Amino acid sequence: MKIGFDNDKYLKTQSARIRERISQFGGKLYLEFGGKLFDDFHASRVLPGFHPDSKITMLKELRDQAEIVIVINASDIEKNKVRGDLGITYDMDLLRLVDAFTNNGLMVGSVVLTRFAEQPSAIAYEKKLKALGLKVYRHYPIDGYPSNIPMIVSEEGFGKNDFIETTRPLVVITAPGPGSGKMATCLSQLYHENKRGVKAGYAKFETFPVWNIPLNHPVNLAYEAATADLDDVNMIDPFHLEAYGETCINYNRDVEVFPVLNAMFESISGSSPYKSPTDMGVNMVGLCISDDAACAEASKQEIIRRYYQAMCEKRKGNGTDAAIRKIELLMKKCNITASNRPAVMAANVKAESTGSPAAAMQMQDGTILTGKTSTLLGASSALLLNALKYLAGIDDSVELLSPLIIAPIMDMKQNHLGGDKESLLHLNEILIALSIASVSDENAAKAMEQLDNLRGLEAHSSVILAQIDESVFKKLGINLTCEPKYEGKKLYRK
């Protein structure tokens, strides 16, 4: 992987920019944090060199000035809304976030239940949070939000919300997912702070789209691909162009809501500190791109991955044709097709020649390895073992796992643990078997030592894999795509 992003520069410039914005507002800033604070793998894929936890590392630079406020929509608690990438509900993810922030030495000041309307589940959750020692505040639905500004900026609007007690100059407002009410929470606090005679400010931190690179730069197009299901569209910020004569990039939702936000700022404090939605941001990512071509190529690969992801989601019954069509248009803008992903053709050709599911992986040196289905191993398991052998310098003819090891595990799974008679071992089972073999087998031990070197490699499967196998690829850091079809015709799949 060719590095295209200066992560050290980013940590310094980003924290400095936030400090500068705090001082601009007299020492109190509410910072709305969009996107992922932890494990931002999208950013690390399109900006090679960006560390997935860069944002939290940057916040740790400000730990003495910052406190965290986590907001959650009470309706999402009631509906048991699930975070798709983690498979856990928003209310559980909030607890995970509290632990993660605390473990990183950051202070979690409180939790806010937004759109609180006496929902039974929200009341029970509030009780649970308080029992865990967390401060909890309630914010209520406001009729006519966000357009009825006289109502919103009044005692019947923001005025009826609880005032969140904060003690530090930087208040980071974050949430388990979108639609949680981060911006409304910030604005409510500005209203209450102003009533108390405190001059507080608002700013927004979002990594994408990157405001100071071209509209159709692959990095920005990759963001559109990632949000294809949300109908987010990157656009030139018309307010910034009018105010400064400069072309900057923002996205439709921020541009659409800016006149309303501006009017709210004026109503709350008499004037607005911002002339454009771009002004509100503090993102410094664009200034830390060190190799534009490397980031552009990485982003094109991300768009292809998102294309396959969208097609597989449609096949599973979760996605839409509209999202697929949108990503196809983005691919045309970048002049790329699925064939620009080398592992795709290799996996599909192997599947066609063998008549069974196959998989392929592109190694760091460009070598393409494949795996085919056999009586004992599935294609993805065979591929993983082949990749480990390649990395460890073990001859391809060597069997890392003897059939004498695999066969009894298969027998136990199929005949004693209720497995399907035709089911093969999953990747996690293969890795457990390999780890056991490594105790007495030198080659298996060498292979195990290479697991970390799989991170960042590209793989493709000719069929949709079982969820457990997809999960193992993800945990190993391998970027997997699949053809949008299943092996076999059964309806129930694990």
What are the language-model segments listed below?
Residues 1-173, 189-350, 356, 363-365, ...:
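Flexible phosphate-sensing "switch/lid" loops adjacent to ATP/NTP-binding sites
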Residues 177-178:
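The conserved Walker
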Residues 392-399, 411-418:
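ATP-dependent carboxylate/acyl-activation modules
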